[in-house]
Amino acid sequence: KYLDLLAAGKASAATAMVDPGVNNDQRTFLTDDVMASATSLLVVEDVVADKNDDSDTRTVTATMQVNGERFTHAFRVTADDATMGVLDNWKIRDSLAVPVTVDGDGIGQFSVGETKASIDKASFYVEGRSFLFYPGAYNFTPVAPNEYVDTTPVSVSVLDDVRTRNNDGKSDVTFKATYNDKLEAAALEAAQTLVESCGTYPGNQGDDCSSLIRGDSVTAISIKEKPTSLDSYSFDPTSFSGSVTYTVTTGEGALFPGTRDVGLTVKVDARFDDDGVLKVTADGKPDFRVSFAF
């Protein structure tokens, strides 16, 4: 009866019959709606009890399939109070709800079907968060935190353990944010804003401007060349840099008075929150740290 309920996608009835024995925050996906979203559910092939007819504890072995993958599971059942003292009753002691550990790099939420959950961690040292699922093949979809992140669903087969295509040896499912061209375009806009702000007098006296283009001896400044594109640096897809050239005129008090070109590198680095998710400003733009380097 229990396996037939799972094969029919009746998660609520199966949970009522056999308690998974975990807190409610781990039962988020033990619902009929989530099982209805599965691309494959449990197929029961065979159910056989052991030969210990006189024992109050028995083992029932079930042979099943999910998405064409066969597996067996041994259930422990114990004798319960008989109905009206005549009909035998048995209680299943272990649920077929399987823990799936989900972690995210730059991803804070995921969904299965229409149900969402946060991948919040108990501490920095904990890998991911565990949720229970009944057997089936599901699409785990990372929720993009903003328009600068692209997401790709992960196909997960839950048998009596977890089968995924991207197992990293730590979590069953690990999402990694993929940053799209919109982030680079926003970084370029942020870089040009600082370049232009520092390319006028007295704008070049701002604290964010390079010491090479500010100071009491600078009497005039203009932009000779500003970046029209940026490159990633340090193998980090969220850190960018580009070249800028200013024409700077210095007067009395300068070591070498006159007009000269000053070449600088403008660097743009995205900021992240404590969970590693890209931060955005109140107007929805990435929160960048923009600075100059030699």
Predicted features, each with a name:
Residues 1-17, 182-199:
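Short, aromatic-enriched amphipathic alpha-helices that serve as compact interaction elements
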Residues 173-178, 184-294:
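Cystatin/cathelin-like cysteine-protease inhibitor module
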Residues 11-69, 205-234:
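Short solvent-exposed beta->alpha transition segments
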Residues 123-147:
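Short Pro-Gly-centered beta-turn/loop motif in secreted/extracellular proteins
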Residues 145-178:
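Structured interaction patches on ligand/partner-binding surfaces of diverse proteins
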Residues 50-127, 240-294:
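Exposed beta-sheet edge and beta->alpha loop/turn motif
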Residues 23-24, 52, 67, 89, ...:
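Detector for Asparagine
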